[in-house]
Curated annotation (Swiss-Prot):
GO cellular component: cytoplasm
Gene expressing this chain: fdhD
Primary localization class, coarse: cytoplasm
UniProt xrefs under SUPFAM superfamilies: Cytidine deaminase-like
Protein name: Sulfur carrier protein FdhD
Source organism superkingdom: Bacteria
The keyword DNA repair is annotated on this UniProt entry: no
GO biological process, alphabetically ordered: Mo-molybdopterin cofactor biosynthetic process
UniProt-listed InterPro entries: Cytidine_deaminase-like, FdhD
GO molecular function, one term: sulfur carrier activity
Keywords (A to Z) from UniProt: Cytoplasm, Molybdenum cofactor biosynthesis
């Protein structure tokens, strides 16, 4: 297992992931008229999370304030800010009056490179393209992925069930995305949830890196956008499965880097877009 050196993590007890509110719900009580019924609802917390590298703010994402160490690490790897886990010397999570700051201490080499590639963005819910200064950064070239394992498609139904069962936040709120990492045998190794699909994936990629990048694949409750493909492939993961559809750019990018891309994953069916050589029927 790879660990961050000089790790400095501080979390606040009042940094919560869900909130309880009273709200009026309209329901058809007797099939003839609607009425307001007051009930308690559980909401997922969404707040600005700023990533600050060596004291300089780099990006602000709207996110759920959980697993923020994983988020910082995964984002840094997927965006090319760092090359390896050891490029981060410390992570400190600080609550502010407006949100959360994740202070990341970078190796000097990476910080110099970051200043050259600087982009400052204020994402909507997990939007990772907003604010890019150069269009080329959006469609950056990815290395070809190796083909190191084969997955039996008959195990996909079980994976979908495991991901559904493990969505603690999603079950409580109904408003979050979930991303799970599975072994080639279909074992659920980790799950991360967030109001933003890209942020949820960043959190999972951070976990994946800390574990030494084990073999396996990603299963997400969202669609497969080009950025989901880009982030997954850039971290060396060979397969991405989405419950919803893929976009055309996502498919083209998956073809270019040899990533197995699957969409519309449902019980008993799925759409294979690319690289079916990793699949066994």
């Amino acid at each position: 297992m790879i660990e961050i050196t000089k790790r400095t993590i501080s979390f606040f007890k009042n940094l919560t992931f869900i909130k309880q509110i009273d709200k009026d719900t309209v329901s058809d009580s007797n099939n003839s008229r609607f009425e307001f019924i007051q009930k308690e609802e559980t909401l997922a917390v969404e707040m600005p999370v700023a990533l600050v590298y060596n004291g300089i703010s780099h990006t602000v994402m709207m996110a759920t304030p959980s697993n923020l160490e994983d988020f910082a690490l995964g984002f840094s790897l997927a965006e090319g800010v760092i090359d390896r886990v050891s490029d981060i010397y410390g992570i400190d999570v600080e609550e502010t009056c407006n949100g959360v700051e994740v202070q990341v201490e970078l190796a000097t080499r990476c910080f110099v490179r970051l200043k050259d590639l600087r982009r400052t963005l204020t994402g909507r819910t997990g939007c990772g393209i907003c604010g890019s200064e150069q269009l080329e950064q959006v469609t950056k070239k990815l290395a070809k992925l190796d083909r190191t394992f084969c997955f039996e498609l008959k195990k996909l139904d079980g994976c979908l069930a495991l991901l559904q069962q493990a969505q603690t936040l999603g079950k409580q709120t109904g408003s979050t995305h979930a991303v799970g990492f599975f072994s080639p045998q279909g074992e659920l190794l980790a799950i991360r949830e967030d109001v933003g699909r890209h942020v949820a994936l960043d959190k999972l990629l951070g976990w994946h890196a800390k574990q030494g990048k084990p073999q396996g694949f990603v299963l997400t409750t969202s669609r497969a956008s080009y950025e989901m493909v880009q982030k997954t492939a850039s971290c060396g993961i060979e397969m991405l499965i989405a419950i919803s559809a893929a976009t055309d750019l996502a498919v083209r990018m998956a073809e270019e880097c040899n990533l197995t891309l699957i969409g519309f994953a449902r019980e008993g069916r799925a759409t294979v877009y690319t690289e079916k050589v990793r699949l066994k029927i």
